[in-house]
Amino acid sequence: MAAGSEATTPVIVAAGAGGEEGEHVKPFKPEKAKEIIMSLQQPAIFCNMVFDWPARHWNAKYLSQVLHGKQIRFRMGMKSMSTVPQFETTCNYVEATLEEFLTWNCDQSSISGPFRDYDHSKFWAYADYKYFVSLFEDKTDLFQDVKWSDFGFPGRNGQESTLWIGSLGAHTPCHLDSYGCNLVFQVQGRKRWHLFPPEDTPFLYPTRIPYEESSVFSKINVVNPDLKRFPQFRKAQRHAVTLSPGQVLFVPRHWWHYVESIDPVTVSINSWIELEEDHLARVEEAITRMLVCALKTAENPQNTRAWLNPTEVEETSHAVNCCYLNAAVSAFFDRCRTSEVVEIQALRTDGEHMKKEELNVCNHMEVGQTGSQNLTTGTDKPEAASPFGPDLVPVAQRSEEPPSERGGIFGSDGKDFVDKDGEHFGKLHCAKRQQIMSNSENAIEEQIASNTTTTPQTFISTDDLLDCLVNPQVTRIVAQLLIQGRSL
């Protein structure tokens, strides 16, 4: 395996390399693969499961021929090592064909066309989140080249998939997906994945700005973190792996992930698998949408692009958002009536747990892993024994990224990773909040006026308030309370 990949990850041998494709036997039958996916609580790599997929040969050159002349939107980002994440709202965008992308990616200095303003040595390009149904709308037969049915999902193919094509350095900021779990098939090139478990949510400083339904972003650039500003990130449990062609990565529900292309051209195909927990998650997302749109639109109605992710067409009105919320709650109850799992009763019996957590909101940044995991995932499922081995490789936890791999393709001496003199963010604000709450309103004003050193910390912006209101832990409690109130 190429340098930088996990030592325990086996190299995938192309079908036919050691014999005819018919001689290959997949290590897991569809039923077993699905059982693993539905029970596994940690990321893992499936090997030798896609050697007979036609999509195995979908490299960028082939796709450029299939999509000849079709305009695709590329996200353009800087090859830099800032401690600030490159969110989609800060990137530029280019409409181009895959042929034009490949020409630009060859680093031709005299290039003209849509990429002419972007120096290949300074910028990366990423055609991300490209849904098959839109990309191949006139070539639907290609849907059959992807066979998620091999993983126990009959009838699931390219129609439920998205395509990702990127250049060296192209990446997705660290985030978690609100819905489902994820299967990612690496077709061409390698990608470096940095993953963090759900219980690390308090240490990743979640934010909903930029706003995108179903995506909770981290304020941290996890490959070059600002530990003075985000000291709790030291507690995060990083899992890292290099995904190679022919491998399929399983990302469990609510695992945070940062993904970066580490080869000149990468092609990936993924599919989000729906889960039972998504019914409650849709209520949480509807609450989030209502709060974000109401507060951010009121703050600056003329500049929605500053806070709305480009994947969202436009901000929705309060009336529309109310409809979304009511529809999500109704769908939840409809599901409960048809499901053998009485989720409402589970919410009721969990009330005592919720009260205990609410009392510890002040210690949000200090909560133990068990408590935060209960809030983040909402369920405590026993982890079934999984047949790990050469064909199912767990993604290992790494206490620290090796210096050569920090920041992916961009070097770093690691000096910015350690801040010995940084203040403890969680304890500082919790103590300050307790002190303020014990005083009268006038005393608070006098304290703020007399202590200029606390002014930057006591100023609360709309985004500061939003980060608290739509924190995944908070919206889950709100969703539970809404449903309890309708079911009593």
Curated annotation (Swiss-Prot):
It holds the Pfam family Cupin_8. Gene3D superfamilies: Cupin (2.60.120.650). Its main location: cytoplasm. Residues 369-379 have a biased composition (Polar residues). GO terms for cellular component: cytoplasm. May play a role in cellular stress response. Interacts with CRYAB and HSPB1. This is HSPB1-associated protein 1. It comes from Homo sapiens.
